[in-house]
Amino acid sequence: MPAQHVNKIIDTLVYNETMILYVSATQGEAAQVPSDYPLIVTGIGIIRATLALTEYLARADELPERIINFGTAGSLSGNTGIFEIDHVFQHDFDHKVIEQIIGKPFPNGIDLPTVSTLPTAHLATGDSFINDPDTRARLAQQAQLCDMEGYAIAFVAQHFGIPCTLIKQVSDNADDAAADTWVDAVDRGAQDLAGAIRTLNQRLNRL
């Protein structure tokens, strides 16, 4: 997203009780989130998500106590509903080749401690909208859901030492109808996502 848009959001942020920063990729996904929740809308994709969140955290006078990324995800296994992610990785980055080149481990995956009562899932993140059966089948061997920002958000949060939670709602089946399904699902699912976010916020405030 344009840097000036991020700066404007930064200037107007007001933290809630437990200093949670909420992050979504699009305005549509965040449409029903309460207006007093501190929110960054990053734009779609790994690069935009990384840039927007890093810029905010680097400039913040005080870091949030937790980052919650929420939004839609494609289903790789036919599941539906809202999930909390317990493991996320970047599916379009071949870390094994890098390991061979440098001769040492090059991790590509982050385990995330869960904090909600939602069902859990593994998430595959990449800079491509999954809508073909071959890619879907390949990713389904490692994850139940796929998106385009989750790993970037978790990676930046880890770098800054901030606990991170990923909440994802299934919007499509990552097949040849995914693009059309996603557009409809964003509007329909915004209310459900907002409800899950409010419930999680209340739970974290009681901890």
Feature annotation, model-predicted:
Residues 5:
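Cationic, low-complexity basic patches in intrinsically disordered or flexible, solvent-exposed regions
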Residues 9-15:
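Short, positively charged and aromatic/hydrophobic N-terminal segments
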Residues 16-21:
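Extreme N-terminal starter segment of soluble prokaryotic enzymes
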Residues 26-207:
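Glycine-rich phosphate- or other oxyanion-binding loops that anchor nucleotides, phosphorylated ligands
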